[in-house]
């Protein structure tokens, strides 16, 4: 049975990083998965707004900041730091996201790169890693 992810947190008290990672590493509920075509294949992914729901639920008090913005070879590259408060202190992970500066897809370059960076940083805490086991 899938656990329902709500806006409510699992606990008001700080949790151990081990418990947070354990919960974020659970398979993402099917209703939170999206699909897109990439490299001739259909891939499943979690949207940035669903990633936020999981972080709010399992890692209350989390935050992120954009640490760096670069433009390299026509690509906008953002580096973010995702910070999670826990019993051990504040644990952070950094990740990058990129997007073509001139693209014709949904959204704009900076929003798309930021979304990718946030999801990648959350994956370093376990969120969505089960999607790569297929």
How would you describe each model-predicted region?
Residues 1-43:
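N-terminal, Lys/Arg- and Ser/Thr-rich interaction peptides
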